[in-house]
Amino acid sequence: MKWRRMPVGPIQANAYFLISDDQCLIFDPGGEGHKINQYIKEKGLTPLAILLTHAHFDHIGALDEVREKWDIPVYLHQNEKNWLADASLNGSGMLRGIEVTAKPADHLIEGDGELNIGPFHLETLFTPGHSPGSVSYYVKDADLVISGDVLFQGGIGRTDLIGGNQETLLTSIHEKLLTLPEHTLVLSGHGPETDVLTEQDQNPFLNGFSL
């Protein structure tokens, strides 16, 4: 199993591809749908689904363009089911003259659980705090977790947007992400990948925090 990061859109949010043979899952198609679709075509991949870590505009900007091209379902946490169609909730309403909206998700995630999509087995980890419906996707077979804007290399997600809460975010990180095996790669919503051990030891936002 392989993965590929593709920074897209004006804020360079990371879209991800999880690839097994000629099939793939797409995570957070935040912009530049033509670029995402072209990569899929060039690699001869068959996408099976789109999984959203959360519904902020920079992670959903190309959602409809990609889903309609490949006719695939979209997964999102139920707490943000109304955000795709509401620019004031997904944050694009703050931008001048740009409102990002998308059609409703096909499948709503309720909390921690498991997803089996084709050859892919994922654990859904409910990790609110950056947003009320943030989900991290743990792929044990690939030793990685796609964390969205919850945890970054040397940083954590912002909590000053709608539904954000710093205490909730820190609890999510410590209870759901830092309890994963230390070698687990953390694929973040912006910037480079990191790993659980590095963030346990070096992340200044997590030092001194205790439950």
Swiss-Prot record:
Cofactor: Zn(2+)
Binding site for Zn(2+) 2: D58, H59, D149, H190
Keywords, alphabetical: Hydrolase, Metal-binding, Zinc
Cofactor note (record): Binds 2 Zn(2+) ions per subunit.
Keyword Hydrolase belongs to the record: yes
InterPro entries: MBL_Glyoxalase_II, Metallo-B-lactamas, RibonucZ/Hydroxyglut_hydro
Pfam families cross-referenced by the UniProt entry: Lactamase_B (PF00753)
One of the record's GO molecular function terms: hydrolase activity
Its EC number(s): 3.-.-.-
UniProt keyword annotation of Transferase present: no
Residue positions binding Zn(2+) 1: H54, H56, H130, D149
SMART domains: Lactamase_B (SM00849)
Enzyme class: hydrolase
Family membership: Belongs to the metallo-beta-lactamase superfamily. Glyoxalase II family.
This protein's name: Probable metallo-hydrolase YqgX
Organism: Bacillus subtilis (strain 168)
Lineage, highest ranks first: Bacteria, Bacillati, Bacillota, Bacilli, Bacillales
